[in-house]
Amino acid sequence: MASLKKSRRVRLILFSGVALVSATALIGYAMRDGIQFFRTPTEVATDPPAANEVLRIGGMVEHGSLVRDGANFSFRVTDGETSFPISYVGIVPDLFREGEGTIATGSVIGGVFRATEILAKHDEVYMPSELAEMEALRD
């Protein structure tokens, strides 16, 4: 009787272990493309995404490429090797400018990255203008 309970317990533990390993492998496989925070322009150019695949592209806003027409923005993002055209409609962050880092979320349509969101990258010493003004008044 005791050996029967022990063998059932061992089988249950083995089955649970196999199920846990399988679930972890399936989750890892499903997330393989989403683990990377953003792709560089070179990666997007050499390995084009599927039609309407939402992804992030990151790099520096190329000097001389930023064109603004009301709320419409078009610019090129570069990683120093390849540049990729981006278009965006909306309000851009205060720190968004040529020569600065940016990450855009969207999809590639007709060879142009159509962004739905723009993030500006900044260093660790960034201080919002409101706080900088308060700091200046305090001094």
From Swiss-Prot:
SUPFAM superfamilies on file: Heme chaperone CcmE
The family note in this entry says: Belongs to the CcmE/CycJ family.
For this protein, the parts annotated as crossing the membrane are 10-30
Name it. Cytochrome c-type biogenesis protein CcmE 2
Q: Could you list which ranges are Periplasmic topological domains? A: 31-139
**Primary subcellular site in the record, as a coarse category:** membrane
Q: Which GO terms describe its biological process?
A: cytochrome complex assembly
A GO-annotated cellular component: plasma membrane
Q: Which UniProt keywords apply?
A: Cell inner membrane, Cell membrane, Cytochrome c-type biogenesis, Heme, Iron, Membrane, Metal-binding, Plasmid, Signal-anchor, Transmembrane, Transmembrane helix
Q: Its membrane topology, per UniProt? A: Single-pass type II membrane protein
Query: Which gene specifies this protein's sequence?
Result: ccmE2
InterPro entries (alphabetical)? CcmE, CcmE-like_sf, NA-bd_OB-fold
Q: Which HAMAP family match?
A: CcmE
Q: What does this protein do?
A: Heme chaperone required for the biogenesis of c-type cytochromes. Transiently binds heme delivered by CcmC and transfers the heme to apo-cytochromes in a process facilitated by CcmF and CcmH.
What GO terms are given for molecular function? Answer: heme binding; metal ion binding
Q: Which residues lie on this side of the membrane: Cytoplasmic?
A: 1-9
Where is it located? Cell inner membrane
Protein residues bound to heme: H122, Y126
Gene3D superfamilies, sorted? Nucleic acid-binding proteins (2.40.50.140)
